[in-house]
Amino acid sequence: MGVERIKAAFENGKKAFIPYVMGGDGGLEILKERIRFLDEAGASIVEIGIPFSDPVADGPTIQRAGKRALDSGVTVKGIFQALIEVRKEVQIPFVLMTYLNPVLAFGKERFIENCMEAGVDGIIVPDLPYEEQDIIAPLLREANIALIPLVTVTSPIERIKKITSESEGFVYAVTVAGVTGVRQNFKDEIHSYLEKVKSHTHLPVVAGFGISTKEHVEEMVTICDGVVVGSKVIELLENEKREEICEFIQATKQKEEA
């Protein structure tokens, strides 16, 4: 399915709620169970983190989750195996969030073959500059897997146009300067930034980094096409507050009807 499965998540004005889970945090059975839960709860896409020892874009919550996964001996191969197994049960799109190093260490051809086998639909590589994306972009295109671009508040318009013109899936618009994590509120210029990104791409635009309340979700999906919630979802899963994740999903869906 690949790119088409991601496109379907945004069809007919749908707003996407994209939770992030760290692959292997709590073990691989827990990963499969969490994906099943998020699928049943109505999440649009699930973003699965590949743990890495030097996660430069991650805030403390995601760093701790990655460290727990690595300390427990979880491997990239193990995560792929878990995804292969759970893919038989769910149709929710899978997007991997991985730094470049694990891809190259695993072998990029082998990594992408495993993505295909596991039914991965897209990949986000936060430390892969646009200028160097040919390291993996041609292989991903061949495999019908979206290489999802990140744009930031400081990205000039021309760069946003260039980055998004050749991309597939959706555009990940980073809503804060700095790392991931929970924020209290967003500055007014974030609204104009998101509108600017939307006006310069044909792809759906999803806001991420720092989104941690229902009010944040409602605010963001009035402007763009969806949200990624990472640190807060990890906290809620850890503390068994799953009903709050369902409330986030409900807040997203309500904006479809508004």
Curated annotation (Swiss-Prot):
E.C. number(s) listed in UniProt: 4.2.1.20
InterPro entries per record: Aldolase_TIM, RibuloseP-bd_barrel, Trp_synthase_alpha_AS, Trp_synthase_suA
Any one of the GO CC terms: cytosol
Catalytic activity: (1S,2R)-1-C-(indol-3-yl)glycerol 3-phosphate + L-serine = D-glyceraldehyde 3-phosphate + L-tryptophan + H2O
SUPFAM superfamilies in the record: Ribulose-phoshate binding barrel
Domain of life: Bacteria
Record key words, sorted: Amino-acid biosynthesis, Aromatic amino acid biosynthesis, Lyase, Tryptophan biosynthesis
GO MF assignments: tryptophan synthase activity
Active site positions, chain numbering: 47, 58
Function noted in UniProt: The alpha subunit is responsible for the aldol cleavage of indoleglycerol phosphate to indole and glyceraldehyde 3-phosphate.
Family: Belongs to the TrpA family.
NCBIfam families: trpA
Quaternary context: Tetramer of two alpha and two beta chains.
Protein name: Tryptophan synthase alpha chain
Higher taxonomy: Bacteria, Bacillati, Bacillota, Bacilli, Bacillales
